[in-house]
Regions:
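Sec/Tat signal peptide C-region and signal peptidase I cleavage site
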Residues: 19-23
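Bacterial N-terminal signal peptides
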Residues: 6-17
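M16 family metallopeptidases and their MPP-like homologs
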Residues: 60-99, 105-153, 166, 170-174, ...
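Mature N-terminal segment immediately following signal peptide/propeptide cleavage
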Residues: 35-76
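Positively charged n-region of N-terminal signal peptides that target proteins for export
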Residues: 1-4
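An aromatic/glycine/proline-enriched structural segment found at the starts
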Residues: 25-36, 194, 198, 202, ...
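Conserved, carboxylate-rich catalytic/transport cores that coordinate ions
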Residues: 221
Length: 488
């Protein structure tokens, strides 16, 4: 997801991202229980074919004839983790420029071409991948494929477009770097991943973006954009022969090349680190807690996913019940498992009243501990599984949703049968499975914690709840590239 901190203006590939609203400054919310999930309705994954072109491009065709539309999603196995040293944001800048002019079309001509057929063309980059997606009606399928091939294979990286995108990205980052939620997530990533590329915002930072040259962008594209490093999903109202014919026509003469990923360090072992970012104008505290977890391909992924959903997933999760319903400390609370190619993390988050900051972070850590120590009840697990299986049809309801699912599965080198058997595999997880993975991967004594808010109003609480060994950093002194996170 590709869960990384990214700009709102860049559409980022993600395996599953959650958006959590900010807490309201209020107290004594009424206790409430969310509605029960609806019974699972029958659903079957549409027929598909997976083929490989002679040049090495993997092509997945999913025949989905419920609407007269087609989605094409092309994924390149290179994202922000492959950014050149000191030039974070390269992959994101490359992605933002794909539809801003090619060797044959200007940015305006691309926009006019897609608008004239009522379609959509988007591109973005995450930690592990760069992707582009085109959505068109069935009668414009060939036009959409031509546009996708053009922006992927022949981006112009025009100097004026580079500067326009650079300026916009830096301006957006300036806004984000004043947002407590963005700051908290960015700092937590650094605590979890250290100096591994996963520890830095995919979008880069203002100083790294300023260093990126046109040659850097062209070299990133030349080095990693290759058919044998790409996955193409074509989903919608097409036949396998139509789709494969179009893929061969547009991408068949794209030359295979050797692709050498840069060497990446192993993520560090989890260690506890508590950081308070002082932002005196804050009216509440952004609280983030997390640790290193498992990669997407782990055989324990399904069980771990359910453990984290019980902790803080959709519906009546434990964090929501304790923090909001029982204690009235926050408006919302959640936890997410964020798996990537080389590693992953589990994080919990909430925004709470300043005077409740210490209590909130204590509760979150205690719930991580309870997950590891206590076997969950059958009814609690059944509720989480009912939500997962009941909402699964929404993830394969449209061509665009299916395209995201299938490229994810192929990218992580999983079987497409994972989508066919999702419900059976989800329901097969037992309370003992959840306890086993929680004990194997959850380490409450090594959780990292970040709080962003008016430190003068809550820092004295931390020692009283067992977290007195914290680092205090004024927001104006924050430097994500420094080992101690401080400007010098």
């Amino acid at each position: 997801m590709l869960h990384r901190v990214a700009l709102a203006s860049v559409i980022v590939f993600a395996v599953g991202a959650a958006s959590v609203g900010r807490a309201q400054v209020a107290t004594n919310w009424p206790s409430e229980n969310p509605p029960r999930p609806l019974p699972s309705r029958p659903v079957s994954f549409p027929p598909y074919e997976l083929r490989t072109l002679p040049n090495g491009m993997q092509v997945i065709v999913v025949m989905h004839h419920e609407q007269p539309e087609v989605t094409m999603r092309l994924l390149v196995r290179a994202g922000a983790a492959y950014d050149p040293p000191g030039k974070g944001g390269t992959a994101s800048l490359v992605a933002s420029l794909l539809n801003q002019g090619t060797a044959t079309r200007s940015a305006r001509e691309i926009a006019d071409a897609i608008d004239s057929i009522g379609g959509a063309l988007d591109a973005g980059a995450g930690s592990d991948v760069t992707s582009a997606t085109v959505l068109v009606m069935k009668d414009s399928f060939d036009v959409g494929m031509n546009l996708l091939g053009d922006v992927i294979r022949r981006p112009a990286f025009a100097p004026e477009e580079i500067e326009r995108q650079r300026t916009q990205t830096i301006q957006n980052l300036g806004v984000s770097l004043e947002d407590p939620d963005f700051i908290a997530r960015a700092v937590l990533n650094r605590l979890i991943y250290g100096f591994h590329p996963y520890g830095f915002p995919d979008s880069g930072m203002p100083d790294t973006i300023a260093k990126i040259t046109r040659e850097d962008l062209r070299e990133f594209h030349r080095r990693y954009f290759a058919p044998n490093n790409s996955i193409l999903a074509i989903v919608g109202d097409v036949t396998a022969d139509e789709a494969m014919g179009a893929a061969t026509r547009v991408f068949g003469d794209w030359q295979r090349q050797a692709v050498q990923p840069p060497p990446l360090p192993e993520p560090p072992r989890p260690t506890r680190r508590i950081v308070v970012i002082d932002k005196p104008d804050s009216v509440q505290t952004a609280v983030r807690v997390g640790q290193l977890a498992i990669a997407r391909k782990s055989p324990d992924y399904m069980s771990m996913d359910q453990a984290v959903r019980i902790l803080g997933g959709e519906g009546s999760n434990r964090l929501f019940r304790v923090l909001r319903s029982e204690r009235g400390l926050t408006y919302s609370a959640s936890a997410d498992l964020n798996p990537m190619l080389l590693a992953g993390d589990v994080t919990a988050e909430t925004d709470t009243r300043t005077e409740a900051s210490g209590e909130a972070v204590r509760v979150i850590v205690d719930e991580f501990t309870r997950l590891q120590r206590e076997r969950i009840g059958d009814a609690e697990l059944a509720g989480a599984q009912a939500y997962m299986t009941g909402s699964f049809p929404l993830t394969i309801e449209t061509p665009g949703a299916i395209a995201r699912q299938v490229v994810n599965v192929v990218f992580y080198d999983l079987s497409l049968d994972e989508l066919r058997t999702y419900r059976q595999r989800a329901n097969a997880v037992t309370p003992d499975d959840v306890l086993r993975v929680a004990r194997a991967y959850v380490q409450p004594d090594r959780l990292s914690m970040v709080m962003v808010g008016d430190a003068a109003r809550f820092k004295d609480q931390l020692g009283k709840v067992g977290f007195g060994n914290y680092e205090l950093i004024p927001l104006s002194s924050l430097d994500l590239s420094a080992a101690d996170l401080k400007k010098h």
